[in-house]
Amino acid sequence: MIKELAWDSAFFKRKIGTLTKVPSDDALQKLLRKAHKDNYLYLTSRVSLKSVSEIQILEKNGFYLTDIGVVWEKQPDADFRPAISVTEASIKDAAMLKKISKGLFKDGRFYNDPFFSYDEAEKLYQAWIDSSFSDREIAIFHVAKKGFITCKKLSRSRGDIPLIGVAARDQGKGIGSNLLYKALEWFRMAGMKTVTVRTQANNVTAMNFYKGLGFSVKYVDATMGKMLKEEIR
């Protein structure tokens, strides 16, 4: 089944969908024909890296690799306390956070997928910051002009960190670890039992960062993309 990603479609001004699961080869070909008729211009699918057969079916039907992600997990059970001032951000801080975020997430799939332009990828992260302020399940913390972290409640017991970023000039100074301490403290106070964060497999610095702070790998996934071209309708 193909599900439209309404927010993505509106932001990129092209109809974008996702495969809710990878079907058989024949079923996928039928879905792709229907997607053409329904005016989709791009489809995405995220699958476990263990599912080699599913990845092969996607590749056979024109999907290409855009991202390999590593999902890390930790229980926020310790009494984490940041050693520097980390405060909750308000909408008034949006412009500052956007400035910090520029160019920080180039390992992300939107920068490496030919369907999206560099400018679109940059603007996407800016838009995510704006939308985070309007989401009641998200809290944002920052170290003024240096870094920020977003914390999202997925359920009563599970939390996730969608974004964490530190300005290039301030990296290596403990800003990131203190932002993470604040996030874990917030999740613990909110009753979360587990916290996840996803990073790209090629971002070795980030992976060593999470490992050093006690996170462990939960699973690895692959994000595949497919452009639906006019000439094959």
Residue spans of the language-model regions?
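Conserved N-terminal entry element of GNAT/NAT acetyltransferase domains
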Residues: 1-5, 10-17, 74-92, 231-233
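Conserved acetyl-CoA binding element of GNAT-fold acetyltransferases
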Residues: 8-23, 70, 157-168
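Short amphipathic alpha-helix that is part of the acyltransferase structural core
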Residues: 14-23, 82-119
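Acyl-donor-binding surface of acyltransferase catalytic domains
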Residues: 20-92, 222-226
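Conserved acetyl-CoA-binding loop-helix of GNAT-fold acetyltransferases
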Residues: 24-34, 163-166, 172-185, 189, ...
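Conserved GNAT acetyl-CoA-binding A-motif
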Residues: 38-48, 187-199
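Conserved active-site alpha-helix within GNAT-family acetyltransferase domains
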Residues: 50-65, 173, 177, 189, ...
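A conserved beta-strand-loop-helix scaffold within acyl/acetyltransferase catalytic domains
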Residues: 110-124, 130-166
